[in-house]
Amino acid sequence: ASKESPEAVHNVLNRHPAMVMEQPRAVDVLMVARENLLYIREALPSAGGFAIDLQNLPPMDAEELDGLMVALRSMAKDNVPVTLVEAISRVQVLHARAAHHNIDLAMARIEDGSGLSEASALPMTGRSKKEHLNSGQTQTGFLLGFAASGHDLAVLMASGVDVVSCAAPMADTEDIAYWLQGTQEDLANELRRVGVKSIDMLQRKHLRALNHETAAVSGLRLAGYERPLPHWFA
């Protein structure tokens, strides 16, 4: 395949914000963690938002988290979105804290060492969202430790997740641009297969579990059986 022009690569990358630890672009979200805390003052004014990684910072109570947010907002551009990141095993605490602090996005990290599968994380997140985030002010997200496919994105969005961030499978910016375009095409193919025109039209009813184990932990309708397994009605 012929190489993309630098401008075309730039345009693709600019349409996709990244979560970064350093050197943020104007569209990027700067992660705030123990590793880069000393360099936040230089980097944050350039970023399009910031994410507080609760899993990689010392424990904080509500007042301490408020204090950190005030300090970070004083360094950031006006009215940038704020994200909280926490382990999926603590998703209820994450959502409760996000609601209390009026956070824009509550993002759960899937690979947190707890052993919870993606399939079991979906109903857990859905129940917590319904309990703690029913005002609609805070969006929910997943932070994946692997490169998501178009199919992965379709499943997550159909499950009610608003934002997905995942690891890029390569470091070169041009390769990342190609990968983003390919993932977008994969997602478009998934939408056509389901018969919807927009990712916003995807719903849980479009999902099917292809095996008994996935149906058991996710509550999805089992393909062929066309309803959730009986224990989900107990």
Write out the residue ranges for each language-model feature.
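N-terminal capping/small domains of soluble enzymes
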Residues: 1-50, 186, 190, 197, ...
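Conserved N-terminal/central alpha/beta ligand/cofactor-binding core
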Residues: 177-178, 189, 193
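Conserved phosphate/anionic-ligand binding catalytic regions in large, soluble enzymes, centered on
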Residues: 156-164, 191-195, 199-202
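Glycine-rich phosphate/ribose-binding loops and adjacent secondary-structure elements
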Residues: 31-32, 47-182
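An almost-null, non-specific background feature
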Residues: 59, 91, 112, 131-134, ...
